Amino acid sequence: MKENAASRVLFILLLFLFASLLNGQSPPEKPKLIKCRSPGKETFTCWWEPGADGGLPTNYTLTYRKEGETLIHECPDYKTGGPNSCYFSKKYTSIWKMYVITVSAINQMGISSSDPLYVDVTYIVEPEPPVNLTLELKHPEDRKPYLWIKWSPPTLTDVKSGWFSIQYEIRLKPEKATDWETHFAPKLTQLKIFNLYPGQKYLVQIRCKPDHGYWSEWSPESFIQIPNDFPVKDTSMWIFVGVLSAVICLIMVWAVALKGYSMVTCILPPVPGPKIKGFDIHLLEKGKSEELLRALESQDFLPTSDCEDLLMEFIEVDDSEDQHLMPHPSKEHMEQGVKPMHLDPDTDSGRGSCDSPSLLSEKCDEPQAYPSKFHIPEGPEKLEDPETNHTCLQAPQSTSGEGKIPYFLANGPKSSTWPFPQPPSLYSPRYSYHNIADVCELALGMAGTTATLLDQTDQHAFKPSKTIETGGEGKAAKQSESEGYSSEPDQDMAWPLLQDKTPLFSAKPLEYVEIHKVSQDGVLALFPKQNEKVDAPETSKEYSKVSRVTDSNILVLIPDLQAQNLTLLEESAKKAPPALP
């Protein structure tokens, strides 16, 4: 019995369910959110489209939450925006916040929810259409008539505060036309329309759009009637230009017809014929080139010639090897000053390349013929720094026959600057000066050469004036014994004839600090500070007066002359070596 009762109840329930299905009752369909719109970024409204209710009463609920929050809120106002809408007032509106909105449909059979809609109020702004649209025809005196359109921004849009800016779009057309003429007016509230058709009735509409958002709806249509006498275009200027152009063209055609040849000649002048003197056109036409060239040659035309034919090529041969290895002796007496008589004849003839220092060193290694007699004092003497005065020691000394002057005073700077081979046994001590002339005078022996040099260069320079002394007089310097140069037996070098017993260097260093005379060729005539004897070393001589500077920037030093110094200089002049023949 119990089993029969349970089966009966289940059967009854199935009958009721089948009956309900036959009556069309079911859960509601899923609703759809259409859009959300904000008129001015302060409030916004959302609309949805409901689905089938399933034959039962259905309730719709809009819920939302802000991005980053978990709390779900229900729509605050279902009535302000109309049916199936939700209105958010300023209290519930936030800028730069994302809203997640969902609509749910509920009845007795079940519940259905829409897909979520993500809304940012900044980008859903859709303002109301502009208001107060005004149309008016203007007839200014100085310009053409036009249609003046004026409007006002939407009431719910705060444009004056600068919250956002609005762009406008105006469209108009004749009443019976199908296409609209569109004009764009950014941030303006008025517009002028020209070139309207007279006698037509125009329809005008306007809409607006914010910087970020959507275009508003078109405003209601406005009408205006254009009168029949309304000028469309000002063609008077074009008519005047056309008439003037036609007149100018007619005048030009008439002038060409009357004076065609003269005008063509003026515009395109003829090419002038050839006017070369002696040029015969007939000879050129006949092809007789020889006669034509003969005619040209007879008209004072200079014959052409190759410039290279006029040049003479020559080679200057210079085989004088000893001329550069040995200095040239002076040939004039140096009465008015020490002047070099020898001038190098080398004037860019290729001798410079042959007289290179490396080549001269090779030439000096070869055996050469030197003057007949040469005396070298005994006893070699090593120097402290042989590089300081190698210039004079490497060059053989020579005295002129008349002036008794070393060769470095008679030759130019070129003959005495290149190195000569130096025997390893020849050395000279370092002195307190490094002048070339001073060192060379020491090489010849200061005892005999200095006086001769002073007597031969300028005897008028012995008048001392305002002697300047840099060192104290009478100071004795201890010096070692003089040592001469030792000559090697296999070298037969040409040196001037010196005294047999005269040492090559003084026993004590000579400090030349006073100049007697400088010649025009840069030769120094030096005076010692005090006269000294070669055989008996005495106090050092200090030179402190400059006599003159030669053309070659060589100083002539004069000592503080005293009576005993003059006597010693005269004695040394008498002992000077005789001149070589």
Swiss-Prot record:
<feature type="topological domain" description="Cytoplasmic">
    <location>
        <begin position="259"/>
        <end position="581"/>
    </location>
</feature>
<feature type="signal peptide">
    <location>
        <begin position="1"/>
        <end position="24"/>
    </location>
</feature>
<keyword id="KW-0325">Glycoprotein</keyword>
<keyword id="KW-0862">Zinc</keyword>
<feature type="compositionally biased region" description="Basic and acidic residues">
    <location>
        <begin position="323"/>
        <end position="349"/>
    </location>
</feature>
<feature type="region of interest" description="Disordered">
    <location>
        <begin position="323"/>
        <end position="388"/>
    </location>
</feature>
<dbReference type="InterPro" id="IPR003528">
    <property type="entry name" value="Long_hematopoietin_rcpt_CS"/>
</dbReference>
<keyword id="KW-0479">Metal-binding</keyword>
<feature type="short sequence motif" description="WSXWS motif">
    <location>
        <begin position="215"/>
        <end position="219"/>
    </location>
</feature>
<dbReference type="GO" id="GO:0009897">
    <property type="term" value="C:external side of plasma membrane"/>
</dbReference>
<dbReference type="GO" id="GO:0017046">
    <property type="term" value="F:peptide hormone binding"/>
</dbReference>
<dbReference type="GO" id="GO:0008284">
    <property type="term" value="P:positive regulation of cell population proliferation"/>
</dbReference>
<keyword id="KW-0677">Repeat</keyword>
<feature type="transmembrane region" description="Helical">
    <location>
        <begin position="238"/>
        <end position="258"/>
    </location>
</feature>
<protein>
    <recommendedName>
        <fullName>Prolactin receptor</fullName>
    </recommendedName>
</protein>
<feature type="short sequence motif" description="Box 1 motif">
    <location>
        <begin position="267"/>
        <end position="275"/>
    </location>
</feature>
<dbReference type="InterPro" id="IPR036116">
    <property type="entry name" value="FN3_sf"/>
</dbReference>
<feature type="domain" description="Fibronectin type-III 1">
    <location>
        <begin position="27"/>
        <end position="127"/>
    </location>
</feature>
<dbReference type="InterPro" id="IPR015152">
    <property type="entry name" value="Growth/epo_recpt_lig-bind"/>
</dbReference>
<comment type="function">
    <text>This is a receptor for the anterior pituitary hormone prolactin.</text>
</comment>
<keyword id="KW-0812">Transmembrane</keyword>
<feature type="region of interest" description="Disordered">
    <location>
        <begin position="462"/>
        <end position="492"/>
    </location>
</feature>
<keyword id="KW-1015">Disulfide bond</keyword>
<keyword id="KW-1133">Transmembrane helix</keyword>
<feature type="domain" description="Fibronectin type-III 2">
    <location>
        <begin position="129"/>
        <end position="229"/>
    </location>
</feature>
<feature type="disulfide bond">
    <location>
        <begin position="36"/>
        <end position="46"/>
    </location>
</feature>
<keyword id="KW-0675">Receptor</keyword>
<dbReference type="GO" id="GO:0004925">
    <property type="term" value="F:prolactin receptor activity"/>
</dbReference>
<feature type="binding site">
    <location>
        <position position="212"/>
    </location>
    <ligand>
        <name>Zn(2+)</name>
    </ligand>
</feature>
<feature type="glycosylation site" description="N-linked (GlcNAc...) asparagine">
    <location>
        <position position="59"/>
    </location>
</feature>
<dbReference type="GO" id="GO:0043235">
    <property type="term" value="C:receptor complex"/>
</dbReference>
<comment type="subunit">
    <text>Interacts with SMARCA1. Interacts with NEK3 and VAV2 and this interaction is prolactin-dependent.</text>
</comment>
<keyword id="KW-0732">Signal</keyword>
<dbReference type="GO" id="GO:0019955">
    <property type="term" value="F:cytokine binding"/>
</dbReference>
<dbReference type="GO" id="GO:0046872">
    <property type="term" value="F:metal ion binding"/>
</dbReference>
<keyword id="KW-0472">Membrane</keyword>
<dbReference type="InterPro" id="IPR013783">
    <property type="entry name" value="Ig-like_fold"/>
</dbReference>
<comment type="similarity">
    <text>Belongs to the type I cytokine receptor family. Type 1 subfamily.</text>
</comment>
<feature type="glycosylation site" description="N-linked (GlcNAc...) asparagine">
    <location>
        <position position="132"/>
    </location>
</feature>
<dbReference type="Pfam" id="PF09067">
    <property type="entry name" value="EpoR_lig-bind"/>
</dbReference>
<feature type="disulfide bond">
    <location>
        <begin position="75"/>
        <end position="86"/>
    </location>
</feature>
<feature type="topological domain" description="Extracellular">
    <location>
        <begin position="25"/>
        <end position="237"/>
    </location>
</feature>
